[in-house]
Amino acid sequence: MRPDTSSLDRWFSVPQPRPAAPMQLFCLPWAGAGAGAFQGWAAAAGPGLEVLPVVLPGREGRFSEPFGIDIGELADAVSARADRPYAIYGHSMGGRLGFEVIRELTRRGEPLPLRLYLGGCRPPDHVEPLAELSEVSDEELLGRLIELGGLPEELLAEPELCELLLPVLRADFTWLHEYVYQPGPPIEVPIEAFAGADDKSISVEAMRGWARHTSAGFTLSVEPGGHFFLRERRDHILDRVRA
């Protein structure tokens, strides 16, 4: 069922609507993050691309909603908002979400994206080591994410912020922990993947495993930086989307 306009709007943060842009880019964040992870992308994209960061339940404008990720509902929202050719970029957990959304849209026979862009994301048939963070202490969870570069070390001095962030982190890592890949045909959407050369959570070789999950072509670029290379490589990624 397609969401109505009011419920559809809550799914997206669109700082610069571009209804005349010939293409849309839906952006899915990593665990614990929200649409704010893609701050500045809309301005950098230029007039030819409308950037739509996704707002997942339990955070940002949906703070009062229960945590939880439902692929069917996410696919409903993307399908309803995609009113022209579009692509999906997913980083880390967001890449797995994007892949499952495409599989759901395929099952429904709905229009598929032109391309799936993935950053720092383990293939769906691989065990995700970070999923174990759903079961560790708060201190270990925050410490591991600081080590990866996903959180600033200064956050530890802000207990109120930690209190707000921890439930989001735990909900997302629980989704990753409970995720079970269901074997199926490769998607009929090209995959363009980006790997951080110094990523401590996933190797470049592991990311090559995405090649077997598409029948429409696969490319992999190795970017300077760690797991969150997209912060410095945003413009390069957008160049690839617009190419």
What are the residue ranges of the model-derived segments?
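Domain-scale detector for complete catalytic domains at protein termini or as standalone homologs
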Residues: 1-89, 93-243
